[in-house]
């Protein structure tokens, strides 16, 4: 064997090539030149038919918590939620004070959840004193976009911590806006749904089984990723306002918080997630409630991961997880990750390999 052949053989494999339709010639040429051992699609792209003729593994992106917009639209109460804080609003005089909720938030992405028990799950706080304002001293205005206090104190600054519905998945939103998908009439804005709701969880499981049956050519299911997105919220200008790769602010729901109280014996409040507007950033010392929430969600997410991985294995396929996007609760360094049964973890940021 020549030295050049030996070098080529030693380089083969361990490389995944992202491909899409209408690039058949380029796919074949790149696979040969780069010695890639697998191909995959990406968010918003589809695999070309030519991949079925290539002697290589086929990975296909699979979204668990979005992609079925019919389900999302017919189950709006089962979309994912996020805790947000209004702008800090000063009272210039004693008496009534109106606080706008959506100032500087992107209305295409989020809107206030007024279907929940707002007196239980929202909070108004005097940031000057740190006092929580009793629910009876404020009310949500009819349009659901502002809160009015009855007796604000002049010179004091107030905020509203509110539960918001995520109407647009953050990653799909980013790709949609960045790539100009608005010009493509076939593109739709995808809403994320929450598997904490039993109906949605059963729908997710059934959909995966059907997808596996309909796609026998796929060797590896590349989950991208699972259920809860890291904190990524846009401002009113349609650009990133708050991003936290480790953020848990978007992993909340009323059923989850109620289950948390039963498990840990104490209730959560909006401020446990809002954290004075820091949203439990990694630069903050985590409080007990936040550490408990991470533990609680990690255990839940990994248990559900294991069930989906088992479905994939039962269909004779491998299961891979992309370390990003909806990765909250899947942390490989967490104590329950080893029990998920996942076959591989991929990470592509700033790298050309998986």
Indicate residue ranges for each PLM-predicted region:
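Conserved small/polar residues in nucleotide/adenosyl-binding loops
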Residues: 348-354
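Mature N-terminal, pre-catalytic/accessory segment of carbohydrate-active enzymes
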Residues: 1-209, 214
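Active-site-proximal, well-structured secondary-structure segments within enzyme catalytic domains
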Residues: 248-296
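Aromatic- and glycine-enriched glycan-recognition loops and surfaces
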Residues: 198-206, 293-307
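Conserved beta-strand positions
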Residues: 39-41, 223, 347
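Aromatic-lined carbohydrate-recognition surfaces of secreted/lumenal glycan-active proteins
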Residues: 17-18, 222, 297-331
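Active-site-proximal loop/turn and secondary-structure-junction residues that shape catalytic pockets
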Residues: 45, 64, 225-227, 323-327, ...
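Active-site groove signature of glycoside hydrolases
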Residues: 215-230, 277-291
């Amino acid at each position: 064997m020549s030295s050049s052949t030996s070098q080529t053989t030693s380089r083969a494999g361990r490389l995944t090539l992202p491909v899409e339709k209408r690039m058949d010639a380029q796919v074949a040429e790149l696979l040969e030149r780069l010695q890639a051992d697998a191909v995959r699609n990406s968010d918003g792209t589809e695999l070309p038919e030519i991949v079925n003729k290539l002697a290589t593994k086929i990975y296909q992106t699979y979204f668990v918590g979005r992609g079925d917009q019919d389900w999302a639209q017919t189950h709006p109460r089962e979309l994912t939620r996020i805790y947000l804080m209004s702008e800090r609003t000063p009272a210039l005089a004693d008496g009534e004070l109106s606080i706008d909720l959506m100032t500087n938030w992107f209305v295409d992405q989020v809107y206030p959840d007024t279907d929940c028990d707002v007196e239980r799950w929202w909070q108004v706080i005097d940031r000057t004193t740190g006092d929580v304002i009793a629910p009876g001293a404020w009310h949500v205005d009819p349009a659901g976009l502002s809160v009015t206090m009855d007796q604000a104190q002049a010179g004091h600054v107030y905020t509203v911590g509110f539960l918001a519905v995520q109407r647009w998945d953050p990653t799909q939103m980013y790709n949609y806006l960045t790539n100009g998908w608005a010009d493509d009439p076939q593109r739709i804005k995808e809403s994320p749904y929450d598997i904490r709701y039993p109906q949605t969880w059963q729908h997710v499981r059934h959909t995966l089984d059907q997808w596996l049956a309909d796609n026998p050519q796929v060797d590896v299911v590349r989950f991208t990723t699972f259920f809860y997105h890291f904190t990524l919220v846009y401002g009113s200008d349609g650009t990133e306002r708050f991003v936290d790769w480790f953020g848990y602010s978007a992993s909340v729901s009323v059923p989850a918080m109620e289950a948390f109280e039963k498990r840990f014996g104490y209730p959560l409040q909006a401020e446990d997630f809002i954290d004075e507007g820091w949203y439990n950033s990694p630069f903050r010392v985590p409080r007990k409630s936040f550490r408990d929430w991470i533990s609680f969600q990690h255990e839940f997410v990994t248990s559900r991961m294991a069930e989906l991985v088992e479905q994939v294995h039962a269909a004779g396929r491998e299961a891979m997880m992309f370390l990003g996007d909806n990765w909250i609760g899947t942390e490989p360094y967490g104590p329950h990750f080893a029990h998920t049964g996942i076959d591989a973890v991929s990470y592509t940021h700033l790298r050309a390999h998986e």
